[in-house]
Amino acid sequence: MSRRHIFTERQRAALFDLPTDELSLLKFYTLGDDDLENIRQRRRPENRIGFALQLCALRYPGRALAPGEMIPREVLSFVGAQLGVPADALLTYATRRQTRQQHMDTLREIYGYKTFTGRGARDLREWTFGQAEDARSNEDLAHRFIVRCRETSTILPAVSTIERLCADALVAAERRIETRIAENLTADVRDHLDKLLSEMLAGNISRFIWLRNFEVGNNSAAANRLLDRLEFLRTLNINHSALASIPAHRIARLRRQGERYFTDGLRDITSDRRWAILAVCVVEWEAAIADAIVETHDRIVGKTWREAKRQHDETISGSKATLTDTIRTFTALGASLLEARSDGTPLEMAVASSVAWDRLAQLVATGTQLSNTLADEPLAYVGQGYHRFRRYAPRMLRCLKLEAAPVAGPLVAAALSIGEMKGVASPERRFLRPSSKWNRHLRAQEKGDTRLWEVAVLFHLRDAFRSGDVWLAHSRRYGDLKQVLVPMIAAQENAKLAVPSNPQDWLADRKARLTIALKRLARAARNGTIPHGSIEDGTLRIDRLTADVPDGAEALILDLYRRMPSVRITDMLLEVDAALGFTDAFTHLRTGAPCRDRIGLLNVLLAEGLNLGLRKMAEATNTHDYWQLSRLARWHVESEAMNQALAIVVAAQGKLPMSRVWGMGTSASSDGQFFPTARHGEAMNMVNAKYGSVPGLKAYTHVSDQFAPFACQSIPATVSEAPYILDGLLMNEVGRHVREQYADTAGFTDHLFGASSLLGYNLVLRIRDLPSKRLYVFNPDTTPRELRKLVGGKAREDLIVANWPDIFRCAATMTAGKIRPSQLLRKLASYPRQNNLAAALREVGRIERTLFIIEWILDTDMQRRAQIGLNKGEAHHALKNALRIGRQGEIRDRTTEGQHYRIAGLNLLTAVIIYWNTVHLGHAVTERRNEGLDVPPEFLPHISPLGWAHILLTGEYLWPKEPKA
């Protein structure tokens, strides 16, 4: 029986093959003078090149060459050129085995290389076992081991030896971690954890399954369901210190395993492992459920506000008829009075003849009532949501362990008094600003009526959580921001930031650039040379660009797509996986081994991408039933694996010759696409009026200039898209190579402009109402006369300088991956008071936005690039809509995780299609040229790899029984 391998063929190649790219050859295989001196001591050319190749292989990847190993032509040419020896000389090298062995002995003697034996091997084994806890995968640990061997001049042992060593080290590390967690638990806690698996609840589900089934809701019943779970978890009394010494990725892995196991499966594993998984789940779920409660409260507040606003609007709308009649009557009365005055008629008679005095009294009362109605605002109606809050809020405030900044102290004190459910004789309003509109409504309340005051507290508590003035300990989303920001020393060492640590250097640079830019714009305004626009009397006018598609491009596009072969979606997936091996990313959550059932895994990915679901796919495929697909999905399909697979496909597509026609991967666009969830979309049951009354979510996708969708996020349909732009750019290597990022008006905020510049991205927005945007300058008095009416204010240099260290730390924290940019930007945008850090970043953003606006006005090429980039992103929507064939295009999953996998699967399938189309479009171009037909290079950028007419998407999904690898 053949031995089972841990590494895939591609992983082995990445770890042990000789490099062939020019950069690696220059880095590792450039020979020094001493090397050349040692090599020239070999008399024959074949011995010189053979000796040199053995030396190069020992240096990188660190192994000995195998007898009869085929050396890549690139390596032979590179090494031979340094020696003046032809590559073919290697053919006669080491006809005697002793020659190769003698050369190896000489290399070991000269350079100090040693074999993996004895004390050195024991030391490396101990070192590897020590590294295993921090390693994220078999491949990661193997890479660390290989690097360590190179550092210690140890020749790599056989691949099978490294596989066994890494596997043993990872298993030992896993057991050490499980034992360490179990030893931190008391006997009572262990008993309580075991009871989670034995206690059965209504519906014949275990307490463990009941605990892990939680989702963010939007009503008081959902909040109470979450509170039931949080209160139960608190009774288990497991301290976070039990996990203090465990690496974060190990905790996340144990949690994900616990969320994949059925109850019976957990009962059957070893006790230490079971207790470790259960303890991690309890600690992690406690924090996650607390976050979900805060998010549910956020949605309830939003729902209450929307209902109050709707009632306010309906009240005003219902008063329109009465208002019209009243105004007409008063108009007639006024006309009668004016006529009587001119005729000399007594005014009393004019009033009596126009309207009776009783009628006039009624009109005055009606007018007063209408005035009050029109002066009202939605706040007058939010008190009607009191009973909704009362059903869960006191309990929530008792359960949550609130911590706050000093500025939010009065608010937390008010919230705790609500949680204690004690009557408040004279409610404090110190948490309100003096100018707050709440004050007027609260003063109008009867003495002793605290209902509106409680609603005000809960509204402001929502805002405080958003801004970070109030936080929860151990929370990922609502934690203390100060604990997340990297220290200033670490921030200054961050080479990824595009700005200096000294604010004066930044200010000097921006002042110089802004002065030059303003002079350029003023000169263009005076001379009337603004492309497609003008500035007249302080008013900016910009005309939209027209389409620029050359004649004949459409005919070429149609011809190339006619040459594309028809293909089943199943065959396409097999072909792309055979070429790229993207399914290798889907390792087993427990063992880390790649999935051996490639067809089953592709079925799961296809079910996600086409929005079919596993049951429908099981009915449509000829290879797997539902339970087989469910097992594969449960243990192999993870968010991280989806991202890795996407990165593999995107990176490969970017290397295709046809991709270079569209761009070099240095620019990208981002846009949100709405997906309806209908009444089944309970996890994100949020309605955006822009898309009608149907609840839904958005897939916010980043698309490179090569059409590759390199990042995709699921976001609520109601939120602003702007904070999520930087998330996608920092998500993987493709995004980090982007220098110019395009977005539409939905991506516009000054905070985003500021953060983008700090991270080195040139943000280019297609702002719909650009002429209404004002410029911000350092000295308005020196602004050219033609532009003074466009200036909106003066940049606050002192504020920027005072807060520059914190701004710098925020940027470094984002690049370090400690917090998502969207989370940080949302917090900064949510401060109810004018926070200094938020205001300073806004000032930075205003300067960057001013520089961008001037450049946009003067640079038609930038406008054209943005239009092309955004068109590429929007063109993806049509392909994704075509792929979303299941469930009438609705995302009906009830969980946030399920919805995320639907969106991620759709994006991965889209990337696979784009890769396949790019390959075959390149073949079609070559075929056309071989036929002697013209393929104008200027036409090729107008072709896109987003067509799908040649792909069979529906019907049965048939797979070969033994696919070719």
Cite the ranges covered by each PLM segment.
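Short, hydrophobic/amphipathic alpha-helical patches that form generic packing surfaces
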Residues: 51-60, 574, 578, 600-611, ...
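Catalytic or ion-translocation cores adjacent to nucleophile or general acid/base/metal-coordination motifs
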Residues: 89, 619-660, 687-805
